[in-house]
């Protein structure tokens, strides 16, 4: 199966897999499997530290379910760049150089540095050596977070319209032990 504009994939941002000949009331997404670093992603965290945040190979586990009629959405960008599983208002203003002009939602994840854009890659290990600009954060939301959410919304609405009810599973992996 191809992943081109005909099924709404966006190069280096997201992939959508689905069959046109068979359909099932299932939508899967893998928001944390991405490994394609955007050109403006310049963390001070090491590659091995960045890999700790990835749900490695989860996308590979679920892609073939599209052959049975499921719609599958995969993020190609890393969650360490911007996390599609966070609210776009879950912004840590302490990592931004300038005044953030949008609403902010304070959550437990944000409090530990793991909001929409991470402050820490691991507990007390900074992600960046300098603050991000307001426009950098806004561009991440516009070019990565929003298209991912729009694609997910479109898939959910299409399947719901077709079947009346659906199964939606947001796929992740877990470490056998925490960040040690």
Range-by-range predicted roles:
Residues 2-168, 174-180:
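N-terminal catalytic or cofactor-binding beta/alpha core of small enzyme domains
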């Amino acid at each position: 199966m191809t992943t081109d504009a005909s099924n709404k994939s966006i190069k280096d941002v997201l992939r959508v897999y689905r069959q046109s000949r068979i359909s099932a009331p299932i939508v899967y997404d893998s928001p944390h499997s991405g490994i394609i670093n955007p050109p403006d992603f310049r963390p001070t965290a090491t590659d091995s530290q960045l890999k700790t945040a990835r749900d490695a190979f989860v996308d590979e586990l679920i892609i073939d379910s599209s052959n049975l009629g499921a719609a599958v959405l995969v993020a190609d960008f890393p969650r360490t760049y911007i996390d599609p599983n966070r609210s776009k208002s879950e912004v840590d203003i302490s990592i931004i150089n300038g005044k953030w002009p949008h609403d902010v939602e304070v959550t437990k994840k944000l409090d530990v540095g793991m909001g929409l854009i991470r402050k820490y890659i691991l507990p007390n290990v900074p992600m960046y050596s300098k603050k991000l600009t307001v426009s950098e954060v806004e561009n991440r939301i516009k070019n990565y977070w929003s298209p991912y959410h729009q694609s997910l919304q479109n898939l959910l609405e299409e399947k719901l319209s077709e079947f009346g009810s659906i199964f939606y599973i947001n796929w992740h992996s877990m470490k056998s032990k925490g960040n040690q």
